């Protein structure tokens, strides 16, 4: 049976039940279980160091009030990073290639930052819709443009993550298919294609990490504007 290249992005089912919930819960197995000691082993040490580094980078643009969001933003980045990397393994499913999931993450968090600004400093939040020193004739047009720019932020967050991961998975699928097809005909070209596939896989690992960081970093910058 011939399958479409996009079939890899469909949610797998087992006995009629979607496995996306299982794929979201499996990354929790990678985290250390709580024990009597602060640090149980070397793996825990590395994980704590990475979590500290991530939290420090995300909290740099925020003031003291924004530090309340540290746990949620760090947890979100850890989840996205783990899911993106696990999705590169063979015969796995990447939930973050689904626009519905990414929008479900982006829209509520963006709305939370917006409502936080409207509650804490409404005048400053509304002032972002009109740049300082705008000529009077341009005020209506600029307010409309800034409002549109504000409203498409969650869409840009979700589409950016979906598009980057989908494009990478499609390239890996296409090059691996070409490598297998060329093996009996042109073995040398097939080997070169496999080398390109290896380099592309390394690049996709970097993209998976960068996109998780960019998603959460943009949320922290939106939060900075409203705190």
Swiss-Prot record:
Gene3D superfamilies: ATP synthase, F0 complex, subunit A. Disulfide bonds: none annotated. It is found in: Mitochondrion inner membrane. Pfam families: ATP-synt_A. Its main location: mitochondrion. PROSITE patterns: ATPASE_A. It is a multi-pass membrane protein. The keyword Transmembrane applies. The chain crosses the membrane at residues 14-34, 69-89, 98-118, 139-159, 167-187, 190-210. Keywords: ATP synthesis, CF(0), Hydrogen ion transport, Ion transport, Membrane, Mitochondrion, Mitochondrion inner membrane, Transmembrane, Transmembrane helix, Transport. It comes from the Eukaryota. The keyword Transport applies. One of its GO terms (molecular function) is proton channel activity. It catalyses: H(+)(in) = H(+)(out). InterPro entries: ATP_synth_F0_asu, ATP_synth_F0_asu_AS, ATP_synth_F0_asu_bact/mt, F0_ATP_A_sf. CDD domains: ATP-synt_Fo_a_6. GO terms for cellular component: mitochondrial inner membrane; proton-transporting ATP synthase complex. PANTHER family: ATP SYNTHASE SUBUNIT A. Component of the ATP synthase complex composed at least of ATP5F1A/subunit alpha, ATP5F1B/subunit beta, ATP5MC1/subunit c (homooctomer), MT-ATP6/subunit a, MT-ATP8/subunit 8, ATP5ME/subunit e, ATP5MF/subunit f, ATP5MG/subunit g, ATP5MK/subunit k, ATP5MJ/subunit j, ATP5F1C/subunit gamma, ATP5F1D/subunit delta, ATP5F1E/subunit epsilon, ATP5PF/subunit F6, ATP5PB/subunit b, ATP5PD/subunit d, ATP5PO/subunit OSCP. This is ATP synthase F(0) complex subunit a. It comes from Anas platyrhynchos (Mallard). The lineage of its organism: Eukaryota, Metazoa, Chordata, Craniata, Vertebrata.
């Amino acid at each position: 049976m011939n399958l479409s290249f996009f079939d890899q992005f469909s949610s797998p089912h087992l006995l009629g039940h979607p496995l996306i919930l299982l794929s979201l819960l499996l990354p929790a197995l990678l985290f250390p279980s709580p024990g009597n000691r602060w640090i149980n082993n070397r793996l825990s040490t590395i994980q704590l160091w990475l979590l500290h580094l991530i939290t420090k980078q995300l909290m740099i643009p925020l003031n003291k009030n924004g530090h309340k969001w540290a746990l949620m933003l760090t947890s979100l980045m850890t989840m996205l990073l783990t899911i993106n990397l696990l999705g590169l393994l063979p015969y796995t499913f990447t939930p973050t290639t689904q626009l519905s999931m990414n929008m479900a993450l982006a829209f509520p968090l963006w709305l939370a930052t917006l409502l936080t600004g409207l509650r804490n400093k409404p005048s400053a939040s509304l002032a972002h819709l009109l740049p300082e020193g705008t000529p009077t004739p341009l005020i209506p047009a600029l307010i409309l443009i800034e409002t549109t720019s504000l409203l498409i932020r969650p869409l840009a967050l979700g589409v950016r993550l979906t598009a980057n991961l989908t494009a990478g998975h499609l390239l890996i699928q296409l090059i691996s298919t070409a490598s297998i097809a060329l093996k009996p005909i042109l073995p040398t070209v097939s080997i070169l294609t496999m080398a390109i596939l290896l380099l592309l896989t390394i690049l996709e690992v970097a993209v998976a990490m960068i996109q998780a960081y960019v998603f959460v970093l943009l949320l922290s910058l939106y939060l900075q504007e409203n705190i």
